[in-house]
Amino acid sequence: ISKDDLVITREAKHYRDGYSANLRIHRPHLARRLNELGCVPNKSKILIINDLLKKDMPEELWSHFIRGYLDGDGWCSLKIDKNNKHILGVGICSASVDILNFFQEKLLQNNITSFVYQGRIYSFHIKKCDLEKFYNYLYKDCGDCKLERKYKNYTVYVDSLDKSKS
């Protein structure tokens, strides 16, 4: 690949809590080749969990699957309000409502309430009173297999709840 064949865009943004970087490389030949290898454009819009996976995946693995999805396409944001109270927001974004509805069903089987909203994309939110149950479900036996940044927000939130109870 020669430098002249590429269209490269770079972007860096500064946010209150850090930086975000984005690098995009555009080349028609590269896109065609990736497509030939099975990487399809806009896969998020066509992503489904097929019936075979739903039927054959052992129940104890679904928490790991959902945690991986949260780590990849979700958020766990921690804020402190004007009364110095910690507020945790947890959710997942997707172009596929089906996958979020499936997660909602799976969590409901574990007595965890969630909501699916439609905006420009679909988003999935955990009900505030079930945040602790949700995280216990996700992290109960994950060992080191977690995105530490999101897990840390949860532990800070739970610690703040414990302090407010005492």
Where are these regions (language model features)?
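Internal intein/HINT superfamily modules and their associated LAGLIDADG
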Residues: 1-166
